[in-house]
Amino acid sequence: MKAPQIFNNAQICHMRERYAAQMGEVDFLHQLAVARLIERLDLIRRDFSHLIDVGAHNGFAAEALQGHEKVGTVLSLDPAPSCVAAASQYGEAHMMDVERLPDDLPKTDAVISLLYLHQVNDVPGLIQQMARQLRPDGLFFAILCGGRTLQELRASMTQAEEEIMGGVSPHIAPMADIKDVGGLLQRAGLAMPVADSELLTVTYSSVFRLMSELKLMGEGNALQGRRSSFTRRDVMMRTAEIYTQKYGTEDGQIPASFELISLTGWSPDASQPKALRPGSAKSSMTDLF
């Protein structure tokens, strides 16, 4: 069954291409995601001679992993030509379809994806493709935005449009809940799946500054059914008013929530620990007392 088409893939590519040169100006989320990746790698007692980065943006991960003692070469994949060109500064980089990996990819020790999967229509399908690229006992690691991301902006825009327009048009993408995405690793055949979530609060001078930075990140509105015209000025002004009234700080700033969900799994291998079968334990609780 075909996945629901929530996003316009052509618009996603257009936004990534248009703002590729400016992503580095507002890359704090990408840098945090890369830091979480490196923290995870540092805890793992093994090396990764080859790694594939899916949705690599400007090669943030490949740049950070240069010289890392546990990582060899990094292959960066992205659907935007300018992102591929930027990532190629740090190693091999190729084009990919928004939701499909190239057919001729080599098997690899690790597949990662940092802040990309939340823009994909068929998340289960892409995770399965990524899992198939792994060698036995290979690492899958991804970070995506979760459902609490931009919850303040979503609520403020919804209220403003209902008041002024009498209805709501799509502006902010629906994002996955951690309870939903954790099961996708098992569906992809990955062992020892783990899902973690952290909520980050970032302050901005205004709603308009927040929305400007979202565009520079390549995270603008790419939803199917979005209005082709610009959002009306009175709606935007009312959104800013509601946002400030409900969430604004004493010093005139506004907070914005970003939920980052981390997914970790491993391709199956005989060397991995396995849970005991029920009833196969060699001792009982009474032996402890």
In which residue ranges do the predicted regions lie?
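Class I SAM-dependent methyltransferase SAM/SAH-binding core
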Residues: 39-104, 110, 124-125
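Catalytic cores of nucleotide-enabled group-transfer and carboxylate-activating enzymes in metabolic
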Residues: 91, 99-101, 105, 130, ...
